[in-house]
Amino acid sequence: MSNEARISLVARVAQLPTAQGMAPSANPPISILALAAASYGLRPSEDATVPTGFDPVAVALFEAIVEGAYLVASADGVFDEGERRTFERVVVAACGGQVPQDRIQALVSDLADQLREDGADQRIAAVAKAVSKKEHAQEVLRIAALLAAATNDVSEIERDVLLKLALGCGLEEKDVDLALAEVRKTLQALHGRAPT
């Protein structure tokens, strides 16, 4: 599968609502990621007036979802410029165009700096702190699992980060297995087979 096709597939899966990752009372159903991305896209610059519809809790949740995926993507210690650009493109596509590329680039740059300064365990704790509801924790885990499963088999170190995210967010080990099974099933259904 080409890189473009893989990015498109991952973005489609990320945008799909799930039983756990669906915004309550959304009609039509929308994923929590998509809803949080909409608010993040409205985030004002430091000098601007806060716009109507801006939700700082949703912004923090969006950042936590992206950081959870970033922590898994960089778990092996190798996150070169090519991987970073691909990760940024996946996030932009998964947001359905609601967040501009330059905002995602700035966010990923901040995440890289924070990971370098704080280490993975502190960043996992920061993600967990931003998550206040079980369905939000499940969405953080789902998107992180999606990024891990979409590129290849989930490595032991990626699974370890997924488990730490789950436990930090108040979930259990079985939730990691459920998230991985769900994203693999959805990837297979949308593509005909899971990417290898």
Model-identified regions with their sequence ranges:
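Small-residue-enriched hydrophobic alpha-helices in membranes
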Residues: M1-L71, V78-T196
